[in-house]
């Protein structure tokens, strides 16, 4: 056993781990961050959008120095069938209030910068080391074991990502429910800034965020995403883990077909593949949030299931940052009390309940169940495409009133199904 004992050991140098370390180090705590990858962020994947409000509260004006890509000013949502796209396009000027902004990011650039901020504040960082187990005395976590080394701490913060094996070893994270997870795949495709601006109708450092439902996930629970970076685009999709067994295509094949869609192919024409990644994504919402606190240990970020897929936007990093701040604040207070028991660390849950994390997780708790409706990803995109096709087809034959067009296609799904799905959607949102 080492003679050195840290105030806190953070396992994982993603967004949550780095921010937790930063906040604690600023308060003068002795903090160690351990990351199994060779650098912070090298094993992390995100679609690519950071809502700024939570990081802005910790590092005011961070975007001036952080390696963010573009500020999002164009929002698009599309229903896709194999041959068509129906798109809602919303454009606005860049928000003047920093807390209202959002940015496209690449994690292999953002995460090292965040870890650097934590190190400058006094945190210690050890990359390339895997934590094999948590050290316990009775029911209390007292440190970590990495190989033959044992490191002690008053508290351990688990920021080890979705499907936390360390959390599971404590019995805090239950066995995986496939319906609570999705598989995400992403390509980063290089284009010139001029090509990106021309193809997405943006200027300067403006950015676009685009979500897709329907054919990208082959009609299964999931969808596609596209985010513009400075000189590349992040293009990918997610598919529910519980649905993959029933899929007619592999997830990589879904991505290849998505890239060849008529609405996507011209946007990536001439681009160079820079990066390919795949990752598990938490999709269960409030239902998958595990036990967050025990004696000497807390769980933050993706490891805690803090992710919201609302259909029109996806949030993960801002919730991870808020949870990290709540955990760090709790550790600072626990040190003042010299009490790192579960009852003392329960302050973390109270901090979360007062933040956007649990308020929003609670408010949108019915969204995951809504997303399990297969009609959202198969029949509804086809219905909307067929209605639009009829509206814009002029062939010399008498046109039906639009009302009859809509009702004709709606009856294929069933008016009762439409009514039930509409009520369920309105309730969930």
Regions found by a protein language model. Give the residues of each.
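C-terminal auxiliary extensions adjacent to catalytic cores
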Residues: 370-429
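Conserved Rossmann-like nucleotide-cofactor binding loop
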Residues: 16, 39, 163
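Active-site-proximal substrate-binding core of FAD-dependent oxidoreductases
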Residues: 326-377
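FAD/FMN-dependent oxidoreductases across multiple families
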Residues: 216-221, 230, 243-323, 339-342, ...
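Short beta-strand to alpha-helix junction loop
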Residues: 96-116, 244-250
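N-terminal Rossmann-like FAD-binding beta1-loop-alpha1 element of flavoenzymes
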Residues: 6-33
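N-terminal FAD cofactor-binding segment of flavoenzymes
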Residues: 27, 37-84
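Predominantly flavin-linked oxidoreductase catalytic cores and closely associated redox partners
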Residues: 117-264
